[in-house]
Curated annotation (Swiss-Prot):
Protein name as annotated: Calmodulin
Pfam families tied to this protein: EF-hand_7 (PF13499)
GO molecular-function term, one example from the UniProt record: calcium ion binding
Binding site for Ca(2+) 2: 57, 59, 61, 63, 68
Binding positions for Ca(2+) 3 per the UniProt entry: 94, 96, 98, 105
Coiled coil: none
Length: 149
């Protein structure tokens, strides 16, 4: 997967890797990963950091080396393609283009897809995705809903 990256991308990722690799030993530890993530406003637990490292740690060293980091970044870039698909899907649901999906818009699209839903079922779908409780689904809520499927 990492072999699909351009030289420019690889050198950008090398730079990013160096930012993570605080002590310059060629690997990223959970401690280093945590430091960088906290500097980006995230607050991962030790277990989450370990999971992130284990996901790409192919040689079982408990750390991420540069080839493993490239694999991780290549995966993330592939995932961003699906982000474009999610944006497209949101636009399909958001008939009036106001940035929100209302119950009526959701019902309309589901009916067009051949799903016969009761008002209660549509309301339930909205309720499940509607994190801020305003009765409609905004883009962030839609992304969360799609990513959790």
């Amino acid at each position: 997967m990492a072999d699909q990256l351009s030289n420019e991308q690889i050198s950008e990722f090398k730079e990013a890797f160096s930012l993570f690799d605080k002590d310059g030993d060629g690997t990223i530890t959970t401690k280093e990963l945590g430091t960088v993530m906290r500097s980006l406003g995230q607050n991962p637990t030790e277990a989450e950091l370990q999971d992130m490292i284990n996901e790409v740690d192919q040689d079982g060293s408990g750390t991420i080396d540069f080839p493993e980091f490239l694999t991780l970044m290549a995966r993330k870039m592939q995932d961003s393609d699906s982000e474009e698909e999610i944006k497209e899907a949101f636009r399909v649901f958001d008939k009036d283009g106001n940035g929100f999906i209302s119950a009526a818009e959701l019902r309309h699209v589901m009916t067009n897809l051949g799903e016969k839903l009761t008002d209660e079922e549509v309301d339930e779908m909205i309720r499940e995705a509607d994190v801020d409780g305003d009765g409609q689904i905004n883009y962030e809520e839609f992304v969360k809903m799609m990513m959790s499927k």
